[in-house]
Amino acid sequence: AGGHLAQFLGVTAGVSEFEGDGGNAGQSSAVTCVVNVYGPSDFTKSYGKSVDAAEVLPLFLGGNLETQRFRHLLSSPLYWVTPRAAPTLCIHGTEDKYVAHEQAVWLVEKMKASGAEADLLTLPGAGHGFKGKDAETAEAALMAFFDKRLKK
């Protein structure tokens, strides 16, 4: 959920339907940048190779794709990409059985096509959750990305 929710914030800043009424109308909901670590971008397509996705998504979205297509679209960051999307780094392993690597590829391609800044760090052979050298590589990329965008 973390990668998906971070990415959703990165593409929906200023969209009135998502601003809410939490009493902070004077504060922007925009984020400076996003690191999406193996988060899904499109709930209407190949989510993963795991049976878990077919079981979990209906609980999260109130029904399966056939009965709640609108919610699946509405909840998918891929469909909210604009040139104003926050700069994004996606980090994803090619052997992720829960969220298919192509989810990151689709998002980065769409962001770049829109003119938004996006990069993809692909970790060959890595699954959902990084260990050892993959974890070190992901952490180094994440820290460099944040340092570039958040340090003044």
Regions found by a protein language model. Name each.
Residues 1-152:
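Alpha/beta-hydrolase superfamily serine-hydrolase fold, recognizing
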